[in-house]
Amino acid sequence: MTKTKKRWGDRKDGRRLRDIDGLHQAMAHLLPNRCDAEIFIKEKMDVTNIIRYIEEKKAEDQASKLKAFHIFVAAIAKTVYHRELLNRFVAGRRFYQRNVVSLAFVVRREFNEESEESLLVLKINEDTDINDISRKITGDVKEIKDGEKGNVDKVLDLFSGLPRPIQMLVAKLVRILDFFGKMPEAITSGDTNYSSVLLSNIGSIKCGAPYHHLNNYGTNSIMITIGEIHKEQVPGKNGMPVIRDVVDFGITLDERIADGFYFARSVKLLKHIIENPALLEEPLIEGVEYEG
């Protein structure tokens, strides 16, 4: 990401945008809540090449822990790096360009209903590749499952033990701090609601990909649910039906950060990367040629 000198009105986590067109600026006031400005995209991704790619990597190295989810994370991060408007957010009725690319998801400590959940936020550098991301996810998830709770989890546990009137006062204070961009970095750095993209890998529990709402709290502008990989009959290049490995993505976006044409081209880029996973062996900042 291009670094710029901090100016008056910038936040710790983003640079204020002062050249927003009148339509979008008006939307920030007419639709002040993120949940009022949600749009939804359901997209079917062909992951046949991803399945082959993982098999090839495991044949080369039996210790490889590469998973389809790791490739999805890398592909989404690469898309955000090359479609910068996706890394914008609206806070306090102003527009900002986020300083970093971060993807977040919830980690269940054990695979059962009673297990506690923890939050994981990955800050992804532009020179990162798929191998770096796979190692980081594998290591961070193991650390969460084996270790203690993070700062945000501990704060939430403390909050849950307070009397209701105190909880209401704290929540009101948090909303004020959030509006003016004054939330402590010790909290926001580990809070999934302050990430570029929030992911939910529903496929890991054998489910499809529903649409998930955004949150008015925080700065997250994109939510993606990932369904279960399955085989499906789809039209081939010559029009004849073929069986392919596919997965559904349920994408929810804040329409105030860009327009429909921009979102559509961004999804097309994401599909191209997913269908060509070898592109992720290069640093994420490396360009991609595709028909937009």
Task: Tell me the role of every PLM-derived stretch.
Residues 1-292:
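C-terminal catalytic/motor cores of large multi-domain enzyme assemblies
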